[in-house]
Design a protein with these regions (language model features):
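ER/Golgi luminal nucleotide-sugar-dependent glycosyltransferases, focusing on the catalytic module
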Residues: 1-237
Length: 237
């Protein structure tokens, strides 16, 4: 199976250097344990040399592009239609993503081998509507490339992630597997809030990766944590 990791960076972003340094250091500390190529999507043009050098140990391919209103999601769709279309799977990762345990890609590959082409998420919630967060997801390129709506602004980004006709719902309607993947299992829609220590529950140790969403929960006081968990655990719809 050929896998491409598409990692988002924002050229000259306020936090980009810090995010990229953490991404690379935690990748090296906690390796994927599965073969992959890394494509760094440079939103807004080529990265400054000092930022690009942070990736030296990972030997990526840099992909400069316009930082349009679709932000990360339009980049992933374009990658699926162009630079990454020849891979079996794409792992789409937002800029704040980082790692705390080795084998994160191996787990996703295992799930893909078990269930087949489809969409595999890292974090699931029922806030607004049930959805897999698009801060990180693992998907067959042709399925992402076939998303029929333009993604050009905040509203269209949210529609893809958690709208009434979200990407995952479109795939499910075609009988494609849509799974939340944790360290010990894969979970179908309706069961994304079942795992212990998932997103916004317990110590979140069941998640394969960390990001800005997991960090905010970690930093919250006990009352806010309870409120976030209760909101995320609302009935599936």
């Amino acid at each position: 199976m050929t896998v491409c990791v598409v990692y988002i960076t924002v050229t000259h972003g306020a936090k980009t250097n810090d995010f990229c340094a953490r991404f690379c250091s935690t990748w090296n500390q906690h390796p994927p344990k599965a073969d992959c190529d890394l494509i760094v999507a440079c939103q807004g043009g080529p990265l400054p040399t000092e930022t690009a050098l942070l990736f030296a140990s990972l030997k990526p391919r840099f992909w400069p592009r316009i930082n349009d209103g679709g932000r990360d999601l339009s980049a992933y769709i374009e990658a699926a239609r162009t630079i990454a279309k020849g891979y079996d799977m794409i792992l789409a990762l937002g800029e704040s993503v980082h790692f705390a345990r080795e084998g994160w890609l191996k787990r996703l590959v295992e799930a893909r081998q078990r269930h087949g082409p489809g969409m595999y998420g890292i974090w699931g919630t029922h806030v607004i509507r049930a959805h897999l967060l698009t801060t990180a997801f693992f998907i067959t390129p042709s399925l992402l490339a076939s998303y029929p709506l333009p993604v050009t602004d905040k509203n269209s980004r949210y529609e893809l992630e958690h709208g009434e006709r979200a990407l995952w719902r479109r795939l499910q309607s075609r009988n494609m597997p849509v799974k939340l993947v944790t360290w010990d299992s894969e979970w179908s829609p309706g069961r994304w809030r079942v795992p212990k220590n998932c997103l916004w529950r317990g110590d979140q140790s069941g998640v394969l990766m960390k990001c800005n969403h997991t960090e905010r929960y970690e930093a919250a006081d006990p009352v806010r944590k309870r409120n976030w968990e209760a909101s995320s655990n609302r009935p599936f719809r």
